[in-house]
Structure formats: C-alpha cells, structure tokens
C-alpha cells in the first residue's frame, strides 16, 4: 500500500526565546537555527522512517533543493515533486526553554498547487492507497474529492484550521488525526473536555476514525466501529515540541497502512513522538523505527 502525502515543504527559522513575544513587545532571541520543515515534510519523513512506502507531492521554490534532497535521503519518493518560480514556504518559530512553540507560516510555493497538478499526481495511485492531507497547501478540497472518488483512504490532519478548511468536504475523510484545539474547531463544541471533543467529532464524522492527541494526556481513538482506545505519554526530557504532532501522525499512518491495529499504531506513534520531543529541531528529531522499538522495549518491557 502506497502513502501519498500531498503536503507542505518549508524552511523553518527557529528562535530560542525566554518567552513568546506579546503584542507590541520586542524581545531578544538567544539563538537562531535553520531547519527543513513543514507539516507535509515532517509527516512524510516520519512515515518513511516508520517503514512505509511514501510519495511526497508538492512544490518548492528555487531555494528548496535541500528540502527535496532531505526527503530523498529519508527514503521518501520525490519523483512527483515540482520546482516553481518563487520562494519556498517558510515558518518563523519561537521556542521557549520549556519546549513550547509558537509558529507563523508563509505558504510560498505551497500555495501554488493547482487542480491540474493534483490530477497528474493522483493518476499514479489506486484504490486502497492512502492520501494524506494537511491544510498548508492550496486546493485541499479538490484533493479530498478526487482522492475519495478514486477509493483512496483519505487521512486528514486539519492544521491549521481555517474557514476555507471548514468549508472543505470533510465528510469524505476516512480518518482524522488532530489535536484538542483543532478538534474543538471541527466538532463545533464549546467544551474543552477531551471526552466531549472526541464524542462530538465521532457524531459529526461517523464514517471516520478519529485520533485525538491530547498533550500530556496522550492520545484518544474513536473508531467508526465504535471502538474506543487511549494511550498515555512516555516520560521524557522535553526539549522541543515542534515535530511532536507530525511524528505521531506519520507513524500512526504508516503503522495502520502496514496492517497494524489502531492500538499498536497508537503505541508506536506515542513512543516516536516522545523521542522526538526529547531532541531539538523538527525533521532532525524524528526517530527511525529501530529507535522506537528499542524505546518500547525499555519502557514497556
């Protein structure tokens, strides 16, 4: 089973700060690091490092050669990637000493995806393959519709949540992987209680599996068959949470695509995410499957 990630590619500019800058405030950064990033890139790398056959489709500018090389070096097929005139997407990220982050994203070439390009990409895939989508590229709604028409398994990581995303045909999704903030926005519930968010999402999207990541409380799962699962987090020294969600997402998708149960996928995705937050950077923090298995042997054995 192939995984097609039609997703973003960014250059991350990460500033180490004592606290997030407030409105009207100027603060000094202690350090600047440049990393390849974007939810799309991170999730493709995570899925590939989990052992999946991953194809990344999307666009970079003339400054994005390093992004495609990183994907290729991580085992991701980049034959469908396009280089366009203009700047690649980039993100400005503030990271505090506790590892929390605040992110501003400029779409760049991520916003230049067209219907014609999506059609040319999808002809390389078939019914049963996985289509992974975030909300950092243009024409997400069209990709959902076409992927669903083909019988692909449409997995949506609805980030960031925007009015345009909420107007997408989200009912076509076969699986959602999202955090509490995204869950509240999609569910339309005023409650911040995890159980209420999960219940509201399951009611609104009865044909989809729901995976809700809930920070220090781990992750919750509600299957379309009525199955409910939960998995806690592992105790690690948190250094940077930037790629935590993307690592979880990529690992979960890879494991389920390989035929593993949701319970097994939650376990490995949670372990991979725990390893990622103990390291600096986004894509550099994503572990290989052998590291995840070794981690689980130490923590679950």
Give residue ranges: language-model regions.
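Positively charged, low-complexity intrinsically disordered leader regions
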Residues: 1-23
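Substrate-binding N-lobe of the ribokinase-like
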Residues: 3, 23-90, 290, 294-300
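Gly/Ala-rich phosphate-binding loop of Rossmann-like dinucleotide-binding domains
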Residues: 48, 148, 257
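Ribokinase/PfkB-type carbohydrate-kinase core domain
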Residues: 1-9, 69-83, 93-229
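Short glycine/proline- and charge-enriched loop/turn segments
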Residues: 21-29, 177-179, 229-232
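Residues at secondary-structure transition points
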Residues: 27, 31-38, 42, 86-87, ...
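Short, conserved phosphate/pyrophosphate- and ester-handling motifs at nucleotide-, phospho-/glycolipid
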Residues: 47, 179, 245
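Conserved phosphate-binding/catalytic region of the ribokinase-like
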Residues: 3, 163, 194-301
